[in-house]
Amino acid sequence: MEELTLEKFEEASEIVKEVTLETKLIYSEYFSAQTGNKVYFKPENMQYTGAYKVRGAYYKISTLTEEEKAKGLITASAGNHAQGVAYAAKLSGVKATVVMPTTTPLIKVNRTKGYGAEVVLAGDVFDEACAYAYKLADEHGYTFVHPFDDLAVATGQGSIAMEIIKELPTVDYILVPIGGGGLCTGVSTLAKLLNPKIKVIGVEPAGANCMQESLKEGHVLTLPQVNTIADGTAVKRPGEKLFPYIQQNVDDIITIEDSELIFAFLDMVENHKMIVENSGLLTVAALKHLNVEKKKIVSILSGGNMDVITMSSIVQHGLIQRDRVFTVSVLLPDKPGELAKVAELLAKEHGNIIKLEHNQFISINRNAAVELRITMEAFGTDHKNQIVSALTDAGYRPKLVKFKGTYSEM
């Protein structure tokens, strides 16, 4: 087995430094207060192309022969790896072909083209695009750059650990997102080489915990399916070449539910004014799972490439889950002035109305009652309960409406 050595990591760090930002650690007062630790973020969401992937891609290219460079590179990806390879190839003066699924959003296709790569659309899912990329590699003699299962790529990603330990030599814990394991392999292996006392914790989505399951079984296995909003780490099978390094160097694996990622997104936007993609938020959500205090912890924010529609959906879901937006249904007599009474009550309780829906057909006898659905903003759960209690005391028999349209009795 090829070995990852300190010499290779040092070489990679010097080479990668030529083309990447040395993203400086950001101290988080908010999360430090929340957890009782000193929390720092390694903001690779601020990196060129919006993610760490350029590090591994650029170092991988540097290890190729002139003949291999002349023939060109190929990879398959619908996300950050595509842009990382395209950008690294452009800087290296090497032709790159990126195979993307036909379902890839146009903005990602255009960004990849913008870095100078030739984009080929093939297959409906990543596996089909990847198979086609291997076929083209065989036909044209291209070098295939794997998104994670490549030790040179992992060595390049390890430059992140070099920067962390250089800036914060006394770091106690490093939290690393895991998809296929390339980033975690590089970071954990170098961290242990530099200081074996550093704890490295891998973080996976609960719905795509292929590394955790593989570690339990003692060998690489394939999940039957994955289900997570963290699409960048939605991997069924971790890297075969990487697995021994994860076994040796990762101290623990934490898994994160999608709802926790939604909360983490809101926390980062509101407290740090930063956009971090769902996979990068894994290490933010994991902070609350660490049963330690007074430790120096670095969470790696692996990327920040999120489309606006996804962002909007996550914000909405987050506000709903934190009871800062809710809908309540009340029944009113169908006569003038009733709506004004409800509005006056809500104003007194400082509820901010977003939307009103008036339904006269809730009852066969509309004179008996009409339904008013009120969607409003609140400051949180206590404030929401205060508003609902006020409606109850006024005789309106409120029912909370779930956003799928079902009722919740009070």
Question: Locations of the language-model features?
Answer:
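PLP-dependent amino-acid enzyme catalytic core
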Residues: 1-410
